[in-house]
Amino acid sequence: MESWKGKYASGLRFSFRKRYSTEKGGTVDEDCEVISIGHKIGDISYVSQEEAQQIDQELFNEYAYSVDQLMELAGHSCAVALAKSYPLTSLKKDATVLVCCGPGNNGGDGLVCARHLKMFGYNPSVFYPKRTDKPLYKNLTIQCEQLDIPFLSHLPKPQLLSDGFSYIVDALFGFSFKGEVRPPFGDVLKTLKEVTVPICSIDVPSGWDVEGGNPDGLQPEFLISLTAPKKCAEKFAGRYHYLGGRFVPPGIIQKYELNLPTYPGTEPCIRLH
């Protein structure tokens, strides 16, 4: 199977402008660029849970990436995509953001994302209820703390979250998630479902089946798929869908016959819709 670039080089590129209301009562114009790939949006690759795990292992074993390398690249791309979707000028509440982190790699991506958001001028806080003693995560936590990013001891009620934050980043579970949600994360997801500010999910909306989705679960406004979109992303009906993690080698793209868009310029992420 040909690569995205080779097979769809003749796709149509067009631009348009959207106008949205801001939280401050004004409006903001958004310049959007869309690549129409033979008018078949479905031609983009959506990988299964097993394929995602195999790709991850090949990045580690065959291409000698380390976990912290990929986590840094992924978390940075998340922060850039969020900054594009929710510019500082469009936010009230002093651009406050809550990043909810789980115990695994998705949570690590969230910690990296929080650090970069801070460097971009946002005011992130972190809710990290199940910490780990692994050095990688301890170091990521220290890096956030050294930037005076506050860590919440408990998750406030939905109304307080909605009043206190411009949006909430869901970095609880990634593509390795299976089975039932375990404590304390069931209560966390229940609370997040009741907030009125945007939920922004990293790679997989937490609580979703990685392939089948979850129509009754969290319904984020924003999703950034990492490496390649997972099958559940086909069920995503939110406003912003990005692809990030610009580190997939051509050999993996060819081996898994991935149809992925070409990142523009030096961008670490690309908007899919």
From Swiss-Prot:
Keyword field: Isomerase, Metal-binding, NAD, NADP, Nucleotide-binding, Potassium
What Pfam families does the entry give? YjeF_N (PF03853)
Its Enzyme Commission number(s) read 5.1.99.6
Per its UniProt entry, which superkingdom is the organism in? Answer: Eukaryota
- All residue ranges annotated as the YjeF N-terminal domain in the record: 52-260
The GO cellular component terms are: mitochondrion
Tell me a Gene Ontology molecular-function term this record carries.
nucleotide binding
Name any cofactors this protein relies on.
Answer: K(+)
Reaction(s) catalysed by this chain, per the record, are: (6R)-NADHX = (6S)-NADHX; (6R)-NADPHX = (6S)-NADPHX
Q: Where does K(+) bind?
A: N106, D170, S206
User: Which SUPFAM superfamilies does the record cross-reference, listed alphabetically?
Assistant: YjeF N-terminal domain-like (SSF64153)
Task: Indicate the enzyme's highest-level EC class.
Answer: isomerase
The cofactor remark states: Binds 1 potassium ion per subunit.
Which InterPro entries does the UniProt entry name for this protein?
YjeF_N_dom, YjeF_N_dom_sf, YJEFN_prot_NAXE-like
Question: Which residues does the annotation say bind (6S)-NADPHX?
Answer: N105, N106, G107, G108, D109, G174, F175, S176, F177, K178, G179, E180, D203
Kindly indicate whether the keyword Nucleotide-binding belongs to this entry: yes
- Say if the entry is tagged with keyword NADP: yes
Q: Which NCBIfam families match?
A: yjeF_nterm
Q: What does this protein do?
A: Catalyzes the epimerization of the S- and R-forms of NAD(P)HX, a damaged form of NAD(P)H that is a result of enzymatic or heat-dependent hydration. This is a prerequisite for the S-specific NAD(P)H-hydrate dehydratase to allow the repair of both epimers of NAD(P)HX.
The record's similarity note reads:
Belongs to the NnrE/AIBP family.
Name this protein carries in UniProt: NAD(P)H-hydrate epimerase
Q: Which organism is it from?
A: Branchiostoma floridae (Florida lancelet)
